[in-house]
């Protein structure tokens, strides 16, 4: 009898969570779908807006967590961003499908999804460029062709060429020495970026994101930093050249995780291009300045890759189900990669959490920092590392850590306040009574000359 009840409840839950239909969703449809998922899974989701587009459309995010709206210490934050280019729409539809899938599988008690939601705070932004999407969708309905129609925002700006250029600073510092992380924004950055870009920058500064992927279209490849080439310009264009980050091996692994879990990306030959293993260094493919994935790596703790997911930027509705089946496992596996490396708390001797402590790994010239709650996350490949935590006013602490291939290693730091060194005693010349310095006696020049002559030996007659 209990088995029949269990089957009935399973079917009831499956029926209540109606799947997202495989069709393109305009802005109003997208908003309805996000709130539909939230209504179906209210205890593990939250819908929030990070700002508005040029045309006033909200940039909505759907959050999945067992405590929506709350950062739990030692629980990593991960994000997906879709539709940055308005006419590259597959990512938008995949993220809607993923949202419904996470909700449905959580309610069906799929233990893999339950564990993912309970141990991770997931943020899904289906569309960063809703204005551009509406232009592209309207053109499709009118059968207007154009490779770039709807790509940019309503001001005609490519949002993936609109972030502050921090690569110049890191390339200089790699050669001459200097900071290797969290490069500051220019003083006038807000006047140089679009509303959508500004909203995303403020968003990623507000959350301690650890891992991210930016979903695009027009090719099928997993692209990892750096995007901007270190090479010299040739005829006004920056020369294509492999430009790795200090975390190059880790980024390659993250890209391969997606590529090999994808239905066909790993095969390499797609859309007339060949990429070994279905991955590429961004600058090795083509150099791109002011891109979002480099900005994430250089300004925050977040490791982001760019996923090019379809040859056709605006695939037909009939192709969406196949694309979803080809990407579903890869989307889940990539989220799970946030649980690797090391993580822990940084505290002082009184167990107060220390924010902005710097976590350095020997041999990797890129540091991360602890968040507002004192927790830090450092993605690493399996191996043995020397890890140091530092904070102003505290003695550094260094430990040796062996990282395995599965769960992240918990490494806490408890920093001791630096003991101020006693200043060496200084000899004070001409010390007089009560510590006063007595001035030297000053003689007139003539008197000094006469005194000198008198001290010289007198010569007798020859």
Swiss-Prot record:
Record-annotated disulphide pairs: 41-103, 271-311
GO cellular component, one term: extracellular space
Glycosylation site positions: 402
Predominant location: secreted
Keywords: Carboxypeptidase, Disulfide bond, Glycoprotein, Hydrolase, Metal-binding, Metalloprotease, Protease, Secreted, Signal, Zinc
Subunit text: Tetramer of two catalytic chains and two glycosylated inactive chains.
Family: Belongs to the peptidase M14 family.
Name of the protein in question: Carboxypeptidase N catalytic chain
Annotated organism of origin: Bos taurus (Bovine)
Lineage, top ranks: Eukaryota, Metazoa, Chordata, Craniata, Vertebrata
């Amino acid at each position: 009898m209990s088995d029949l009840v269990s089957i009935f409840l399973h079917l009831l839950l499956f029926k209540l969570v109606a799947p997202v239909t495989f069709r393109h969703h305009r802005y109003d449809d997208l908003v309805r779908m996000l709130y539909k998922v939230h209504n179906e899974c209210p205890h593990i989701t939250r819908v929030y807006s990070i700002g508005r587009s040029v045309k006033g459309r909200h940039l909505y995010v759907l959050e999945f967590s067992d405590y929506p709206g709350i950062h739990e210490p030692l629980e990593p934050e991960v994000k997906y961003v879709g539709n940055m280019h308005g006419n590259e729409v597959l990512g938008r539809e995949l993220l809607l499908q993923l949202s419904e899938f996470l909700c449905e599988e959580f309610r069906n008690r799929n233990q893999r999804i339950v564990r993912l939601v309970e141990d991770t705070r997931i943020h899904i932004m289906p569309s960063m460029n809703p204005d551009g999407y509406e232009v592209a969708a309207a053109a499709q309905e009118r059968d207007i062709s154009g490779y770039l129609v709807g790509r940019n925002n309503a001001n005609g700006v490519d949002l993936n060429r609109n972030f502050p250029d921090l690569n110049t600073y890191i390339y200089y510092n790699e050669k001459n020495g200097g900071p290797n992380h969290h490069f500051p924004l220019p003083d006038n950055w807000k006047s140089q970026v679009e509303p959508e870009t500004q909203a995303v920058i403020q968003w990623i500064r507000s959350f301690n994101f650890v891992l991210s992927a930016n979903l695009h279209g027009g090719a099928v490849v997993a692209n990892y930093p750096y995007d901007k080439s270190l090479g010299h310009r040739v005829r006004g264009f920056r020369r294509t050249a492999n430009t790795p980050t200090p975390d190059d091996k880790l980024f390659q692994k993250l890209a391969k995780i997606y590529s090999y879990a994808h239905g066909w990306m790993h095969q390499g030959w797609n859309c007339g291009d060949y990429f070994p293993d279905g991955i590429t260094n961004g600058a090795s493919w083509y150099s791109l300045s002011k891109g979002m994935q480099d900005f994430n790596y250089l300004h925050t703790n977040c490791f982001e890759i760019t996923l090019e997911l379809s040859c056709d930027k605006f695939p037909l509705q009939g192709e969406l189900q196949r694309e979803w089946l080809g990407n579903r496992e890869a989307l889940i596996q990539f989220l799970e990669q946030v649980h690797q490396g090391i993580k822990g708390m940084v505290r002082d001797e009184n167990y107060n959490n220390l924010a902005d402590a710097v976590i350095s790994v020997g041999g990797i010239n890129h540091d991360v920092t602890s968040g507002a709650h004192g927790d830090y996350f450092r993605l690493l490949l399996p191996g043995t590392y020397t890890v140091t935590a530092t904070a102003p006013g505290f003695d550094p602490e260094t430990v040796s850590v062996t990282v395995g291939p599965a769960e992240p290693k918990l490494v806490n730091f408890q920093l001791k306040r630096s003991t101020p060194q006693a200043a060496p005693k200084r000899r004070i010349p001409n010390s007089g009574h009560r510590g006063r310095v007595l001035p030297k006696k000053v003689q007139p020049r003539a008197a000094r000359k006469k005194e000198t002559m008198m001290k010289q030996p007198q010569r007798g007659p020859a």
